[in-house]
């Protein structure tokens, strides 16, 4: 990998504070671009708009989803913009390249009874249930990203006005409240689970060795919980974020509030969560339409 590409990734890590998962995606996008350059005997310094169009065709030939292609093009556009700030790249060959239209999809989420089943599973785990419950509670009760979760320190938790302070994308800080269930789980965890592991750091969540838990560790915990929960087959941290947003909106929270809680810059990003379940649609219809119910 070229030095300028390494410098770009370092900037994303240090200045933008991107998560490990996001950094890996950017790294892989650049590596795939480098493979194309080598195959086509092209020079990074002499890459032009026509070459960018050819690269777009190359990506489509790999049968990638439009969302994946769009992200890879965004990575390279951003990389060249960074390069130009270093007074090395003269032009950005991707600046005029039209983004492929993204596929529209409804975010997957859990129903409330599925969430209760997950909580029942961790409640019955005597060994590590207290820790796993806090992970579930924080992800579901606050909608935070897994990258934000693993960086929470004990001093970021406020038990007086229950909530947590997190550092989001771009180093932006926000405070998210949580309820009594989450508060009680946190108190039990801090009182009886974490002290037994003799942790010599102030990160909130730990693995079974007492070290700060990683994003991979959180995913492992969630997958383990799902394996032991009847009727639930798939889970990932972002699905809990989707669930938080969906349940908040279905219960009447306004879009701007949810945007603020999620840490979204654009309201349109939050807007995709305005899908509702069929049960919610029927509930609203029955309560709102004058001819939905027949008087006896």
Swiss-Prot record:
It is found in: Cytoplasm. Keywords: Cell cycle, Cell division, Chromosome partition, Cytoplasm, DNA integration, DNA recombination, DNA-binding. The active site is at 145, 169, 238, 241, 264, 273 (o-(3'-phospho-dna)-tyrosine intermediate). Residues 105-286 form the Tyr recombinase domain. Its main location: cytoplasm. Residues 1-84 form the Core-binding (CB) domain. The keyword Cytoplasm applies. It comes from the Bacteria. One of its GO terms (biological process) is chromosome segregation. GO terms for molecular function: DNA binding; tyrosine-based site-specific recombinase activity. One of its GO terms (cellular component) is cytoplasm. The keyword Secreted does not apply. Belongs to the 'phage' integrase family. XerC subfamily. Forms a cyclic heterotetrameric complex composed of two molecules of XerC and two molecules of XerD. Site-specific tyrosine recombinase, which acts by catalyzing the cutting and rejoining of the recombining DNA molecules. The XerC-XerD complex is essential to convert dimers of the bacterial chromosome into monomers to permit their segregation at cell division. It also contributes to the segregational stability of plasmids. HAMAP family: Recomb_XerC_XerD (MF_01808). PANTHER family: PHAGE INTEGRASE-RELATED, TYROSINE RECOMBINASE XERC. This is Tyrosine recombinase XerC. It comes from Staphylococcus saprophyticus subsp. saprophyticus (strain ATCC 15305 / DSM 20229 / NCIMB 8711 / NCTC 7292 / S-41). The lineage of its organism: Bacteria, Bacillati, Bacillota, Bacilli, Bacillales. The gene is xerC.
């Amino acid at each position: 990998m070229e030095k300028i590409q390494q410098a770009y990734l370092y900037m994303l890590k240090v200045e933008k504070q991107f998560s490990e998962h996001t950094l890996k995606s950017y790294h892989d996008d650049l590596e795939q671009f480098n493979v194309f350059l080598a195959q086509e005997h092209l020079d990074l310094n002499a890459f032009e708009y026509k070459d960018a169009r050819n690269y777009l065709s190359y990506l489509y030939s790999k049968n990638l989803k439009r969302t994946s292609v769009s992200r890879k093009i965004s990575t390279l556009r951003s990389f060249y913009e960074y390069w130009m700030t270093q007074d090395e790249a003269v032009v950005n060959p991707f600046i005029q390249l039209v983004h492929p239209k993204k596929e529209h999809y409804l975010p997957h989420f859990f129903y409330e009874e599925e969430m209760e089943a997950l909580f029942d599973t961790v409640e019955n785990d005597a060994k590590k249930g207290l820790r796993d419950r806090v992970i579930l509670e924080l992800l579901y009760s606050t909608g935070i990203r897994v990258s934000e979760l693993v960086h929470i320190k004990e001093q970021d938790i406020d038990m007086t006005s229950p909530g947590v302070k997190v550092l989001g994308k771009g180093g932006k800080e926000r405070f998210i409240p949580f309820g009594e269930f989450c508060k009680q789980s946190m108190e039990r965890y801090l009182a009886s689970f974490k002290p037994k592991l003799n942790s010599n750091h102030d990160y909130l969540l730990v693995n079974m060795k007492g070290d700060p838990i990683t994003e991979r560790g959180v995913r492992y915990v969630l997958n383990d919980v799902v394996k032991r929960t009847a009727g639930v087959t798939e889970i990932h941290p972002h699905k809990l974020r989707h669930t938080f947003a969906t349940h908040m909106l279905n219960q009447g929270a306004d879009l701007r509030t949810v945007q603020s809680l999620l840490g979204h810059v654009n309201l349109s990003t939050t807007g995709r969560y305005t899908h509702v379940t069929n049960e919610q649609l029927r509930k609203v219809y029955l309560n709102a339409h004058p001819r939905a119910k027949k008087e006896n």
